Amino acid sequence: MTPKLLENPLRIGLRQDKVPEPQILVIFGATGDLTQRKLVPAIYEMHLERRLPPELTIVGVARRDWSDDYFREHLRQGVEQFGGGIQAEEVWNTFAQGLFFAPGNIDDPQFYQTLRDRLANLDELRGTRGNRTFYLSVAPRFFGEAAKQLGAAGMLADPAKTRLVVEKPFGRDLSSAQVLNAILQNVCRESQIYRIDHYLGKETVQNLLVFRFANAIFEPLWNRQYIDHVQITVAETVGLEGRAGYYETAGALRDMVQNHLMQLFSLTAMEPPNSLGADGIRNEKVKVVQATRLADIDDLSLSAVRGQYKAGWMNGRSVPAYRDEEGADPQSFTPTYVAMKLLVDNWRWQGVPFYLRTGKRMPKKVTEIAIQFKTVPHLMFQSATQKVNSPNVLVLRIQPNEGVSLRFEVKTPGSSQRTRSVDMDFRYDTAFGSPTQEAYSRLLVDCMLGDQTLFTRADEVEASWRVVTPLLESWDDPRQAAGISFYEAGTWEPAEAEQLINRDGRRWRRL
């Protein structure tokens, strides 16, 4: 098979996308899983597709005393195991010439002086013109320290040439998020800060804005007059996966709801932006989150449910309870499941509930946004399968099988006027003949191009934390620990989560 880099783009009809300027990508925490499993495989894939400058240079930073050659071999294994493979040895060799390693401690000022000098030398060697992207793929407690040290060493001084990428979580509550934002904004401008949430790199998430605002048939229906409610689901089949140290201090509310689910929510509920520029879109996301609240502040049990998985069965094998996982507290009350009901106080959404849920050890891995429309005001037809007609449902599938489906009623064959529900289905891989790209691919290119559209702004982070703050304050209180519910691994949710939506006369979608 001909490697992508060696193909003639004119012959295969490719449009050449804008390529970032030559630059150095400095990855802090480069020996971690994210770099080997996600970042570098995505970068190499883009290298094959000619979407990155040939001068692109990657410098890995970590405490381990690795050589450049060892680092290159480590990343090669990642591309082979987690990416699309090397494809052509000469292509990999060219790419690997731009991979370097810089051992050092994140809190050592002298290391940053050494790093600055080495980057300057690489500018001369590789022709990267002083352009820098610093990617903080480290434990959250090191975000502030790394930013301070980079600022003190003068490596963030040029807003036109330097960028700082921060992985989630952005704080662990409103107060810590404000502190982190203050530190970041003290050493560089907001225009240099890229708070990355990989969900925003997924095709269906990006397509949500196009779907809403480029199709005249949907946006006029996108309001309280036609929509009954919205369900947003992020279900995972995995357990802790060796992350007990982090997860014990986070839980599902901090790990998933405040970032991933709130991002999906804001894109679904936002008003049309005045432009497709970064701030045009982000301004509207902030506005809708600021107008959002829990359904009942006085009685939080009517707004949200937390759960933790017990021992159960997944794919025919027994799996342990959360408390029995390696590294977990045997008496832990950390939630692995959250369901919540949000309301938006504006004209478009007044009275329309948004139900959000996420959990670990669910029966299947699925992420979707389901828009359920109101039923017809007068029923003239009889359903062939049930007493009432099913409502129309528009589903945006984020993963797996990214795509969009619309459920509607049709007449069954024969002389009767009975109806049944059918789905009109669109899938990216079928329609475009190839699977969607890795989420990090789009985000990394956008960052290098200086496009902040798919990255979270400081005020949006703080607005999201404000929405969930009442739950954090209650659930973090040891006196409220007994309020957690339990569900068996391999099942969808605790009974209390069913009650949360059933008391409104609705039910969770079957997935």
From Swiss-Prot:
Keywords for the protein's UniProt record, in alphabetical order: Carbohydrate metabolism, Glucose metabolism, NADP, Oxidoreductase
Native source species: Synechococcus elongatus (strain ATCC 33912 / PCC 7942 / FACHB-805)
Class of this enzyme: oxidoreductase
Catalytic activity annotation: D-glucose 6-phosphate + NADP(+) = 6-phospho-D-glucono-1,5-lactone + NADPH + H(+)
Positions of substrate binding: H198, K202, E236, D255, K360, K365
Pathway: Carbohydrate degradation; pentose phosphate pathway; D-ribulose 5-phosphate from D-glucose 6-phosphate (oxidative stage): step 1/3
EC number assigned by the record: 1.1.1.49
UniProt keyword Oxidoreductase, yes or no: yes
Binding-site residues for NADP(+), renumbered to this chain: R63, K168
Protein name: Glucose-6-phosphate 1-dehydrogenase
Cystine bridges: none
Active site residues of this protein: H260
Biological role stated in the UniProt entry: Catalyzes the oxidation of glucose 6-phosphate to 6-phosphogluconolactone.
The family this protein is said to belong to: Belongs to the glucose-6-phosphate dehydrogenase family.
Upper lineage: Bacteria, Bacillati, Cyanobacteriota, Cyanophyceae, Synechococcales
PROSITE patterns linked to this entry: G6P_DEHYDROGENASE (PS00069)
Recorded GO MF terms: glucose-6-phosphate dehydrogenase activity; NADP binding
Gene Ontology BP, a term: pentose-phosphate shunt, oxidative branch
Database matches in InterPro entries: G6P_DH, G6P_DH_AS, G6P_DH_C, G6P_DH_NAD-bd, NAD(P)-bd_dom_sf
Pfam families documented for this protein: G6PD_C (PF02781), G6PD_N (PF00479)
Listed GO CC annotations: cytosol
